[in-house]
């Protein structure tokens, strides 16, 4: 989409129709092997929100789809595998459960990256629709190759 502006309308908000946003969503494919967890999550969150686009507005859902392969082979820096702790609490007394990052990666490898991405998105009504556009895969797959994803 090319937008022509003149000196008089530089202060006006660029309006893009919802149909255009939905039809022109790109698909990105990321191989998570050896990549740092939080840096990878931050770059995925930028693609999901659409902050890399010229017509970004925080109240529009202008983001793209992201497919992450080898989500179980992410890396972390320092001693985070043993010192980073995830907590769950059901609300009952004495029912606080804790799990380290290494334990969580063994139990469900995609949860770690999913929660990291979710934590980096804005806490509003658009977070759940944006999270539906993330596909986390353990290993590799050719299931999404018909969309011709762009590799990051």
Feature roles, as predicted:
Residues 2-115, 125, 147-152:
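Ribosome large-subunit tunnel/peptidyl-transferase-proximal elements
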Residues 127, 131-152:
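Charged phosphate-binding loop/patch that engages nucleotide di/tri-phosphates or the phosphate backbone
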Residues 113-114, 118, 131:
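Hydrophobic, well-ordered secondary-structure segments
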């Amino acid at each position: 989409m090319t937008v022509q502006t003149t000196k008089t309308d530089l202060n006006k908000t660029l309006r893009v129709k919802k149909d255009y946003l939905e039809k022109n969503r790109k698909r990105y494919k990321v191989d998570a092997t050896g990549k740092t967890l939080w840096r990878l999550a931050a770059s995925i969150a930028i693609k999901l929100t659409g902050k890399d686009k010229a017509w970004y507005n925080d109240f529009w859902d202008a983001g793209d789809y992201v497919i992450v392969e080898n989500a179980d082979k992410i890396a972390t820096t320092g001693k985070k595998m043993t010192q980073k702790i995830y907590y769950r609490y059901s609300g009952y007394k004495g029912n606080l459960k804790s799990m380290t990052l290494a334990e969580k990666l063994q139990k469900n490898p995609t949860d770690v990256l999913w929660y990291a991405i979710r934590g980096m998105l804005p806490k509003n009504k658009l977070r759940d629709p944006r999270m539906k556009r993330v596909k986390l895969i353990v290993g590799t797959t050719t299931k999404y190759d018909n969309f011709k994803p762009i590799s990051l």
